[in-house]
UniProtKB/Swiss-Prot annotation:
This is Small ribosomal subunit protein uS10. It comes from Hyphomonas neptunium (strain ATCC 15444). The lineage of its organism: Bacteria, Pseudomonadati, Pseudomonadota, Alphaproteobacteria, Hyphomonadales. One of its GO terms (cellular component) is ribosome. GO terms for molecular function: structural constituent of ribosome; tRNA binding. The gene is rpsJ. Part of the 30S ribosomal subunit.
Amino acid sequence: MERQNIRIRLKAFDHRALDMSAKEIVNTAKRTGAEVRGPVPLPTRIERFTVNRSPHIDKKSREQFEIRTHTRILDIVDPTPQTVDALMKLDLSSGVGIEIKLEGAR
């Protein structure tokens, strides 16, 4: 029988909230007896925007903004039913996006 993996991908603008959420998921999974790989930090995606400061003239006067998106990946290897139930009941902080995929073992 093929083993199952749960791959969890976390995204957030604030890296502290992201790390706290990842730590909470790892603690929950380990408490229920599952093996956890990660969190693995992926490269930070930086989007930069340059806008004119004034609405009319002064092309040379500009302002720059950036958005940093931090990403982490966790793999839960061969989860138990208790692990899945505990992860479903887990309440993560706001501002952290979570994407869960169920896949076969590699």
